[in-house]
């Protein structure tokens, strides 16, 4: 969708099945469904909330995410996607990362772009540093540029337009994880 990477959006065009796990499938993430062009496209939604599992003509799986995926894996048995599809995904992801590397590279312009500023911070961040963002155009930039170096090190809020969340959110994260650095990106909406 609008906040996603080109690689995921490109793959979505030809995919025949997507499994949405614990997501509300908002327009931000789906591109208002314009990305799914395959006429045979099917959707499975794994969600603990019945309302969110029953969206977009999906096959709902009303379940805890982990338990639901364990059951789906069990039902799939030894089935695997074909190698051509996996290679297409890898190549697309590689191209996406090359694109991001170009966007964050220094240039001779007077002021750095959002991507360049975020990239500079990212380059110097430790693997345990936590990035937080929430409002304005900066959210999309951070989402695309920041590639978490370890689990649970990226926090964003954009689905409910809670301008200023990143400030309170960062304080709460720092209280919960005092030994980790918290990096806050304040957007133009805060």
What are the functions of these language-model segments?
Residues 48-51, 100, 181:
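Generic signal for short, ordered secondary-structure residues
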Residues 93-179:
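Active-site diphosphate/adenylate-binding microenvironment
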Residues 20-22, 46, 132-136, 157, ...:
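Generic beta-strand/beta-sheet core signal
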Residues 16-18, 42-43, 128-131, 181-183:
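Beta-sheet entry/capping signal
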Residues 2-89:
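Glycine-rich, acidic loop regions that bind phosphate or pyrophosphate groups
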Residues 1, 9-14, 53-54, 62, ...:
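Thiamine diphosphate
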């Amino acid at each position: 969708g609008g906040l996603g990477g080109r690689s995921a959006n490109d793959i979505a065009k030809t995919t025949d099945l997507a499994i949405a796990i614990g997501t509300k499938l908002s327009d931000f993430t789906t591109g208002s469904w314009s990305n799914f062009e395959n006429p045979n496209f099917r959707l499975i939604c794994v969600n603990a909330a019945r309302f969110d599992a029953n969206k977009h003509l999906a096959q709902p799986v009303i379940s805890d995410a982990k338990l639901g995926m364990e059951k789906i894996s069990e039902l799939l048995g030894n089935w695997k996607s074909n190698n051509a599809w996996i290679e297409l995904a890898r190549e697309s992801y590689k191209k996406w990362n090359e694109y991001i590397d170009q966007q964050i590279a220094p240039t001779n312009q007077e002021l750095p772009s959002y991507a360049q500023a975020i990239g500079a911070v990212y380059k110097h961040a430790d693997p345990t540093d936590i990035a937080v963002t929430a409002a304005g155009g900066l959210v999309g930039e951070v989402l695309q540029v920041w590639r978490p170096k370890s689990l649970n090190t990226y926090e964003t809020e954009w689905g409910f337009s809670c301008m200023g969340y990143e400030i309170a959110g960062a304080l709460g994260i720092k209280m919960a994880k005092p030994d980790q650095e918290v990096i806050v990106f304040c957007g133009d909406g805060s």
